[in-house]
């Protein structure tokens, strides 16, 4: 029961879309209505408002980290086990992808996944973030960087921690993140994908 309750709480935390919240507070258009239509930091950046994009990035990452950290810190006292912690990691990510508070129209989960990985193991999170930064720096495609980082994240985890329930959760997160980027993959292949910092009319 503890596993399910903590997973449900994590899903609700993940369901808070900071792209939508920040945009409303800062008087920007709904991120679903412009650019890629994705409620995430990269799309918010297309408005030209860097502060809004930064707040979105921090918020989405923080909720992923917070859900897993709180569960790992306080969960065991209430019966949360390793399987439950893996469920929490996956649930907060699913909340971002399919948020109950925003008609299940969520983002692609890059920042939230990063927060989850940092909470699981800071070195794991930093290694995955470093992978993203390297690809983004050289190729200037946020989506490509996310895809490569997603591929390496489960590999990094297994090398550091071995195969367990959390490894399964990280693998599922990676697969879902890649699946959410299917349109970006098509655009990358056709040369139509937007580069980092490129503005679009909103």
Curated annotation (Swiss-Prot):
GO molecular function, one term: acyl-phosphate glycerol-3-phosphate acyltransferase activity
Major localization class: membrane
Span of the signal peptide: none
Any one annotated GO CC term: plasma membrane
Organism placement in taxonomy: Bacteria, Pseudomonadati, Pseudomonadota, Betaproteobacteria, Burkholderiales
Entry superkingdom: Bacteria
Protein task: Catalyzes the transfer of an acyl group from acyl-phosphate (acyl-PO(4)) to glycerol-3-phosphate (G3P) to form lysophosphatidic acid (LPA). This enzyme utilizes acyl-phosphate as fatty acyl donor, but not acyl-CoA or acyl-ACP.
Keywords tagged on the record: Cell inner membrane, Cell membrane, Lipid biosynthesis, Lipid metabolism, Membrane, Phospholipid biosynthesis, Phospholipid metabolism, Transferase, Transmembrane, Transmembrane helix
Entry's Gene Ontology BP terms: phospholipid biosynthetic process
Membrane topology: Multi-pass membrane protein
EC number, UniProt record: 2.3.1.275
Reactions catalysed: an acyl phosphate + sn-glycerol 3-phosphate = a 1-acyl-sn-glycero-3-phosphate + phosphate
Self-association state and partner proteins as the record states: Probably interacts with PlsX.
Transmembrane segments: 2-22, 85-105, 119-139, 158-178
Similarity field: Belongs to the PlsY family.
Pathway note: Lipid metabolism; phospholipid metabolism
Subcellular location: Cell inner membrane
Record protein name field: Glycerol-3-phosphate acyltransferase
The keyword Repeat is annotated on this UniProt entry: no
Enzyme class: transferase
């Amino acid at each position: 029961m503890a596993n399910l309750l903590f997973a449900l709480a994590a899903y609700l935390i993940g369901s808070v879309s900071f792209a939508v919240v920040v945009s409303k507070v800062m008087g920007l258009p709904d991120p679903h209505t412009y650019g890629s239509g994705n409620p995430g930091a990269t799309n918010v950046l297309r408005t030209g408002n860097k502060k809004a994009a930064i707040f979105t990035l921090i918020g989405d990452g923080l909720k992923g980290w917070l859900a897993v950290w709180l569960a790992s810190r306080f969960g065991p006292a209430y019966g949360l086990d390793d399987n439950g912690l893996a469920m929490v990691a996956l649930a907060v990510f699913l909340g971002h992808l399919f948020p109950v508070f925003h008609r299940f129209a969520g983002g692609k989960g890059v920042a939230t996944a990063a927060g989850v990985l940092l909470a699981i193991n800071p070195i794991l999170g930093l290694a995955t973030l470093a992978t993203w930064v390297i690809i983004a720096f050289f190729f200037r495609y946020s989506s490509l960087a996310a895809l490569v980082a997603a591929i390496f994240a489960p590999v990094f985890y297994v090398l550091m921690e071995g195969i367990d329930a959390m490894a399964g959760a990280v693998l599922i997160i990676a697969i879902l993140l890649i699946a959410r980027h299917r349109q970006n993959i098509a655009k990358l292949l056709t040369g139509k994908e937007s580069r980092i910092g490129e503005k679009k009319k909103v």
